[in-house]
Amino acid sequence: MKRKIFVLAAIVMASGGIGVAADARTTWAQNCASCHGKDGSGNTMMGKKLSVKDYHDAKVQAAFSDAEAERAIKEGVKTNGKETMKPFGNKLSDADIKALVAYIRSFKK
């Protein structure tokens, strides 16, 4: 009986993880891809204009912590006093933001 419950719990947790990944992909497509690119490369017109980093690059990924990424998504980013990324803290939940950071980490090659 315990084994059946364990297997069922594992299936539920695994399917939840798939849903989170799909949700993060959708959130990325709707809110981030226009600047950061569908694939996280930053190779878009706006990304080039803003000098967006390529999230495939392991060095780029190593340059910021998950907490820093979460803060940037929540609060936005300013460069020399000019907003270069709008804040999403009023639009996305903490869970959405954490899922986005995990999705960003998945771009690393």
Report the location of each language-model feature.
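The canonical Cys-X-X-Cys-His
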Residues: Q30-K38, L100
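Electrostatic cytochrome c docking/interface patches
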Residues: M13-A29, N43, A58, A63
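Short sequence/structural segments immediately N-terminal
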Residues: D23-Q30, N80, F107-K109
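Post-cleavage N-terminal segment of exported redox proteins
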Residues: M1-A22, Y103-K109
